[in-house]
Amino acid sequence: MLNSFDAAYHSLCEEVLEIGNTRNDRTNTGTISKFGHQLRFDLSKGFPLLTTKKVSFKLVATELLWFIKGDTNIQYLLKYNNNIWNEWAFENYIKSDEYNGPDMTDFGHRALSDPEFNEQYKEQMKQFKQRILEDDTFAKQFGDLGNVYGKQWRDWVDKDGNHFDQLKTVIEQIKHNPDSRRHIVSAWNPTEIDTMALPPCHTMFQFYVQDGKLSCQLYQRSADIFLGVPFNIASYALLTHLIAKECGLEVGEFVHTFGDAHIYSNHIDAIQTQLARESFNPPTLKINSDKSIFDINYEDLEIVDYESHPAIKAPIAV
């Protein structure tokens, strides 16, 4: 048996495996892909942290709070031992004149196929992370990912150089004009794509208020189904909870709409392992603070009664 959250995710995986198109991709890994899909999660029934594999709430929450703070430097994430953005910052570093270590070209693929190189890569990454944490000047130069999510959410700059805080504006709109159809935040800024370490995969979200409940719909242009989507589901569910609390509302639905939803060819075995598992009951979320969404910390958040199967490792495509 599967709870409704795991069942929705499993249905996406199964459909892509069954009818998806085999495609090449930017990372030269290869994918099975479906264009256009939608999942719905009733947040009143629990918190959608998948249980058929362990998903780290700490990683989900610290990344989201990083976005909310408008931060774009991995130093904040590394202080919470959150490594999910390391590869993109590291790639910029090894391409710079500052780097003088062993050749790290195409480290993502080489680390998977060459054990000796993998040890070199892990050592270089370890040194890189340590310098980011200990050397603020180095972190400022090589830890920053450019104008990624947090920058667009909190400090969108228009063609005239005016700065606009999308997230704060949307929260005020929800409070004062809940029926508006303009509760939208976009991370997709076409004029700044080239200034981002990775263009936004989850590109735009919209809020909807009905009967005192706040719902959120995300449009995700590109979705790594195995590694990314479980985090994205939990992240936007958490964002919905935080904004609902900020606005004095209950939570409604999280609606997840996909463009290119894909399974990487080297994730298929891992996906099939997960699909063979039964689920546990979903956990619940507690927000143990009355702080503003802009001041809340990871330590103020708590996941209650989370039981899951073990995590399943798979390589990230860079």
Curated annotation (Swiss-Prot):
Subcellular location: Cytoplasm
Active site location: C201 (nucleophile)
InterPro entries assigned to the protein according to its UniProt record, in alphabetical order: Thymidate_synth/dCMP_Mease, Thymidate_synth/dCMP_Mease_dom, Thymidate_synth/dCMP_Mease_sf, Thymidylate_synthase, Thymidylate_synthase_AS
Ranges in coiled-coil conformation: none
Residues reported to bind dUMP: R26, R181, R182, R221, S222, A223, D224, N232, H262, I263, Y264
Pfam families the UniProt entry points to: Thymidylat_synt
Self-association and partners: Homodimer.
Full protein name: Thymidylate synthase
Source species: Staphylococcus aureus (strain Mu50 / ATCC 700699)
Gene: thyA
